[in-house]
Amino acid sequence: MRIIDNKALRLRLRDPDKVTNAIPKSKKVGDNEVVVKWGLEEAQILNQLGIKSPSPIEVKYIWTGRYQPFDHQVSTSSFLTIHQKGFCFNEQGTGKTASAIWASDFLMKQGVVNRVLVVCPLSIMDSAWRDDLFTFATHRTVSVAHGSADKRKKIVQEGADYVIKNYNDIGIVLDELKKGGFDLIIVDEATHYKNAQTRRWKLLRQLIHDNTWLWMMTGTPAA
C-alpha cells in the first residue's frame, strides 16, 4: 500500500476487481493495482474487505487539546474511526480516553456523528471523562448527567455534544436518551456489561441500533 499525497491509496492486490466493485470511484491501474480515494468511508470498506487500511484521521485531523498524541494513541484513534462497533482493550494508563475523544471529535467534524453518550462508572465521570474532555476537546460542550432524576433528564435534553452518564441508572433517563440523538456510545469499563442477561445490558441494548457507533473500552478484559 502506498499513500499518494495524503489523498489516495494505491494498492497492489491479487484481485483488484473486488475493490473496484465495492468502491465505484476507485480506479484500476494495470493488472494488479488499484487507486482509491483515501476517505473515511473508503477506508472502512477496504477493512471490511479484509484489506487493512489506516484511517484518514492519521493525516487529516488536527489533534486538538493541550497535548499531542503518542503513536499508539494515533493508532487507537485510527482503529476506532474505522470500526463502527469495536472493542478497545489497551492496557490501563495508555490514554484510551483521549484516543476515544479524538476519534469521536474527528467523526463529528466529518459529519458522521452528532452526539456522543459516554457510559461509565460514577467514580470516573468527572476525574477521567469530564477532565479529559476539557483537556482534549475544549471546543466541545460537555455535560455530566448526575443528580436528581429531573436534573439528569434536563441535562440529557440540553443538547451537549458529549453527555457522561453513570451505567447504574440508565433506566431513569432511558426515554430521554432514546430521543437524544446519540449516534455514538462509548462504554468505559465495559466488563460491567459482559453478561448480556443483566438488566444493565438490556437497558443499554435499547439505545443501540444498526447505525449506532458503539465502542466498548476496558483495560482489564479478563476481569
Predicted regions and their residues:
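SF2 helicase/translocase NTPase motor core
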Residues: 17-30, 52-78, 82-85, 94-212
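Contiguous N-terminal and early-domain "leader" segments and peripheral loops that mark the onset or edge
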Residues: 34-36, 189, 216-217
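Conserved helicase ATPase motor motifs in RecA-like P-loop NTPase domains
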Residues: 91-93, 211-223
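A broadly tuned preference for mixed-charge, low-complexity surface segments
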Residues: 49-56, 218-222
